[in-house]
Amino acid sequence: MLSPQFLILSLISGLQLLSLADADPMIEVFRWKQMDFYNRGDGHLSSGGRKDRPSFSAPVVFPGKYSRRKRKIMTSRDTPVVVSSRADSDDPNASYIPYNNVPMGATHFRGRLFVTMPRRRVGIPSTLNYIDLAEDGSNRSPKLRAYPNFALNQFNASAENLVSVYRTSVDACQRLWFIDTGMLEYPNNRQQIRRPSIWVVDLATDQVLKRFDVPESIAETGRGLASITVDVKAGQCGDAYAYIPDLVYRRLYVYHLRNDRIWSFEHNYFNFDPLSGDLSIGGQTFRWDDGIFSITLGAQKLDGSRDAYFHPMASTNEFVVSNRVLQQESNAARSDHGNDFRVLGSRGPSTQSTMHAYDPGTGVIFFDEIQRNGVGCWKTSKPISAENYGSVDSNAEDMIYPSDLSIDEDGTIWVMSNSMPIFIYSTLDTSIYNFRIWKQKASLAKRGTVCE
């Protein structure tokens, strides 16, 4: 006969296994050792490539106009001198250098997965790309297609073309929004070759609907413009607002599409936390001082307003402000914002985050966790705290530095992990998989966590 102690232990073990079974980790969709393109820009096309051929004329540079003093503490946008010296050997006219292509953003919309490739080194054929899931979805390491076409990605062919894009966003009107930083972030040779700009593309026609150059009076350079969040209701597409965090200058920019105007908010909550800037990721130990990095919009309230949740990357705190405050241009000129900007609380130790996104179907915000190499979650109906902050997945081997997180219209979370600290401070091993894209339904990702 089985002893009571054995039965109790068996029951506990079974409950633990059931709890583990309820949890649904992120699913690896794609992985790459090095990135490749259908059109590398060298005149040699892979299957499915276009016959566009780039011009290699020198870019137009504004010498010294946007220069900044060297920073003693670095952001994620800086490169150490020891690493910069290795990049000096790159051919400045090379159209494609495989090692230099590090993907940053991933956004899905109806069978197309948009993947960005910021120009932090030479040899990047196209900064804005996509994967056709119907055609290439079965390939675990698919090549990228330039979007909306290869020609528009050739910054040195026209002053109207794309320079460098970090992340994208799809709005309720089926439009793709992104910031072109206008900057070539080459080691020891950072160049602001044109003004940073906001772009809007119609995903039904792939036509550019709008390009807005950010004036120098608002943002001196595009160096800190790494993401964009769009606030618009379906059926009111002309009345869109875009919220753009500046991680370098620690500001929040608001662009109004209808009036074609942009304004800038400043607040202490946009600064990095000096106690949260020491990081250890992928075997690299370093210090970053990235300020406000990500903004996500919560559920619509009875009065029609929405909360805008935000955080600096070098911080474990979450903050909030009403979108009504941001949309009033006159508020940006105030010297004191009173209690309009609020501290919600800390997510807990080692929860520094790049991007986060709110899922309306579950009421949960999901976070990229760079220290934990994973994805976290918080149910917005609960107070934010370490106890109410959950872990969806964590993988120190395969999910090194999750750089982007977005949720599509079907409630699927998409995450990019790109080993960026290893690329910046050491050397990527090109014999192993360095870049991955993951996905999971938000309704499943929260199972078995405190975010239920």
From Swiss-Prot:
The keyword Transmembrane does not apply. Its EC number is 5.3.3.12. Residues 1-23 form the signal peptide. Pfam families: MRJP. Glycans are attached at N93, N156. GO terms for molecular function: dopachrome isomerase activity; dopaminechrome tautomerase activity. Pathway: Pigment biosynthesis; melanin biosynthesis. Keywords: Glycoprotein, Isomerase, Melanin biosynthesis, Secreted, Signal. It comes from the Eukaryota. It is an enzyme of class 5 (isomerase). It is found in: Secreted. InterPro entries: 6-blade_b-propeller_TolB-like, Royal_jelly/protein_yellow. The keyword Membrane does not apply. One of its GO terms (biological process) is indole-containing compound biosynthetic process. It catalyses: L-dopachrome = 5,6-dihydroxyindole-2-carboxylate. Gene3D superfamilies: TolB, C-terminal domain (2.120.10.30). One of its GO terms (cellular component) is extracellular region. Belongs to the major royal jelly protein family. Tautomerization of L-dopachrome with decarboxylation to give 5,6-dihydroxyindole (DHI). Also catalyzes the tautomerization of the methyl ester of L-dopachrome and dopamine chrome. May play a role in melanization reactions during late pupal and adult stages. This is L-dopachrome tautomerase yellow-f2. It comes from Drosophila melanogaster (Fruit fly).
